Amino acid sequence: MKRYAYIVVLLFFITTSLSAQIKIGNYRFKDGAEYTGELKGKRPNGKGKTVFLSGDIYEGEYVKGKRQGEGTYLFHDGEKYVGEWFNDQQHGKGTFHFMNNNRYEGMWYADYQEGEG
């Protein structure tokens, strides 16, 4: 019984400390872009939205202040990328919607289309 109580208390403290690390707030990048969303250690980490000075908007996941995971980037001219990100770059599976209604659906590597799609 003591072992069970110990495990319950330990799990409580672990979940409490983890949830305390993530908070909702705002962050301004060096280039002036404004982020609103989950923060960890004063940096974007988790889900959030960034509005860039150009008018571009990114909504999706961040890890240690960089776009990483699933996200959507809407360019100010109406073009859009929906897909995976790694280290602030389009990387992995994704779809790019062009202004002329064409689209590329396929793999991306370091911001470049990989293959024919």
Language model: regions and residue ranges:
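N-terminal segments that cap or nucleate solenoid repeat domains
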Residues: 20-57
